[in-house]
């Protein structure tokens, strides 16, 4: 029996000055927008301010995760600090969920008692938001194309951009038609958008924390690819999980044919897993005969699939 363990740095997350400037711009604008929202009493402005705060959190999570990812592993954290991004995303999603519920309740209360709103401050708030978001998008757009961590922050900013457009629509409808219910209606609608966004963030974070298989990886397909290699008789106890976004890990057992060269099989399998599926860290156990794994049937996906097909 032989084992090989290997790791590759791959693409390390990087915060960069663009991310930091974006965080500062968005943070300052959140304070201004929340002040305008409380002053005018606009549910749409307040809901967008909450989401702007979430965007600040998303950018800060990306920055902190990028910096923590560079910390070396130690005896207490043998995989390093990659999971900091996932924990931060879960907290961010929970906060976004709470904000969504608050906005929906505020909107429902305002439906029962609509109030006239000063539209000029609302338009100024939206204009400032669009300017801030355009600058932020320009700062991190290029980096988001190659960094999944930054891409998450980018989507937060895009959602705040949509919120600013909703404020403009609200202010213009009130100014030219006097239809006051547009504010709570759009506020509630945006609250449900926040609810949807929070669910997506929390679902993905929980899936990763539970060491779920990445969405773009099929264990069945990987097993078949391994068994198609020369010298591999069987692949079992295969596991794939993500330390954080885009950092995939794989482990598995390979039973090789009696006339096969274990080292050659190991090298070929390792290269295929890295090049075809993008695993940055792989642990493969090579066997000439299946070992006693009677206490681990529950976590052998390949065995469960074979039994279900029998």
Walk through the language-model features, giving the residues of each.
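Alpha-helical transmembrane segments and adjacent TM-loop junctions that form the membrane-embedded core
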Residues: 2-21, 44, 50, 54-310
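The first (N-terminal) embedded transmembrane alpha-helix
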Residues: 21-33
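Short, hydrophobic transmembrane alpha-helix segments
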Residues: 34-48
